[in-house]
Every structure is written in structure tokens, then in C-alpha cells.
């Protein structure tokens, strides 16, 4: 279909930590901004989310906060770009400069890095506007767009709540169906 979620699931992605401010999992006395979602995984293939993505970064050093990680960039017609970052990987199957397609295998989930408490995929999304401004966005907003365009019927569940619901609700009440994740973030 040209669209995929970052891991394959039958019904839902189990989110262990959503986007936003949280208690630091490694130091409970501190708050931190979590710039992604943590998806429960166990040796899962991690997948490209759209067609025509370009691998723009690969980190094979497991002794960094995000461990083995990679970033795929997708260009938009308005000159902006979306970057999807996958962290804590066990293994990476792509190299910088590779072009990837939706559902294509990028690597395998793992537990690498100095900022992890167990195996999971940290999936982060960043908008880069045409003027070069960068902004971390809620991956649920981005994946709601992917779900809509790709007719993907999965949920992203955290504590029993579907994190996609607020973005799906917005899609049903707005006549303009092609809102960007950033457009949803401003609602």
C-alpha cells in the first residue's frame, strides 16, 4: 500500500512509554522529555513506514544513549521532510544512502544503548520544515496519518488507551483529509 507501521502486528502496538514529559526511567527523581514512543518488542523486524525513504543516519555504536540506531527521511511535496528514528536496535540491515520502501526491513529490535531498561523500539518522528526548522512531534500523530493513507487498522495502546484516537477523531470532523502530522499537532 505504500505505508507501514514500524513493526508488524496483528491488532495493536503495545506502547510502554508515550511521547511527552515523563519520570526518567533511570533516575526517578528527574523529569525528562521523551521525544518518541517506546514499543514493546522481542526480536522484531523494524520496518520503513513509507515508500522512497532515504537512510540519512546509522549508528552502530551500542554504547551510546540510543544504542544502535538509524534514521530514515521522507521528502514532502512542500519542501519539508519527515525523519523517523529507530533506537536500541540489535542489528541494522541498511546503510546511509540506501532508499527504502514501506514495510522494508531496516533491522531488528533489541536492547542496546545506555538509556534502556529492557528490549523495546524507541520510535521518534521529527518534522523538518522547508526553512530548516526542526520539531519533534508525537509519533502517534504521524502514525495516524500513515494508518489513514495506508488503511491500517491497528491501535497504539498505552494503559488501555489508543494513542491514535485523538488524531483519528480529528480526521473524521475536518473536511480536509490531508492534514500533516504537524497540522494535527496544532488542533
What spans do the regions from the language model cover?
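Zn2+-dependent peptidoglycan hydrolase active-site motif and core
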Residues: 32-35, 49-93, 114, 118-124
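Acidic, glycine-rich catalytic/binding loops that coordinate metals and/or anionic ligands
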Residues: 98, 124-187
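Short, well-structured beta-strand-loop connectors
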Residues: 46-57, 94-109
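A residue-level detector for short acidic-glycine micro-motifs
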Residues: 17, 41, 57, 88-91, ...
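Short glycine/threonine/proline-enriched tight-turn/helix- or strand-capping micro-motif at secondary-structure
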Residues: 14-49, 73-74, 120
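Structural detector for hydrophobic anchor residues on beta-strands
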Residues: 11, 45-47, 51, 82, ...
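Non-catalytic extracellular/periplasmic "stalk"
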Residues: 1-4
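Active-site scaffold segments
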Residues: 36-38, 102, 107-108, 120-126
Amino acid at each position: 500500500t505504500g505505508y507501514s507501521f514500524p513493526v508488524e502486528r496483528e491488532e495493536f502496538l503495545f506502547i510502554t512509554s508515550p511521547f511527552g514529559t515523563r519520570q526518567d526511567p533511570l533516575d526517578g527523581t528527574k523529569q525528562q522529555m521523551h521525544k518518541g514512543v517506546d514499543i514493546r518488542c522481542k526480536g522484531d523486524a523494524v520496518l520503513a513506514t513509507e515508500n522512497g525513504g532515504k537512510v540519512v543516519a546509522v549508528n552502530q555504536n551500542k554504547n551510546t544513549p540510543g544504542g544502535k540506531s538509524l534514521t530514515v527521511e521522507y521528502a514532502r511535496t512542500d519542501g519539508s521532510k519527515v525523519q523517523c528514528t529507530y533506537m536500541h536496535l540489535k542489528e541494522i540491515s541498511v546503510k546511509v544512502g540506501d532508499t527504502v520502501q514501506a514495510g522494508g526491513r531496516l533491522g531488528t529490535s533489541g536492547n542496546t544503548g545506555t538509556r534502556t531498561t529492557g528490549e523495546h523500539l524507541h520510535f521518534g518522528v521529527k518534522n523538518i520544515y522547508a526553512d530548516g526548522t526542526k520539531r519533534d512531534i508525537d509519533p502517534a500523530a504521524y502514525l495516524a496519518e500513515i494508518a489513514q493513507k495506508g488503511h491500517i487498522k491497528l491501535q497504539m495502546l498505552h494503559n488501555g488507551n489508543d494513542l491514535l484516537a485523538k488524531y483519528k477523531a480529528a480526521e473524521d470532523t475536518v473536511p480536509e483529509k490531508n492534514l500533516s502530522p504537524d497540522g494535527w499537532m496544532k488542533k
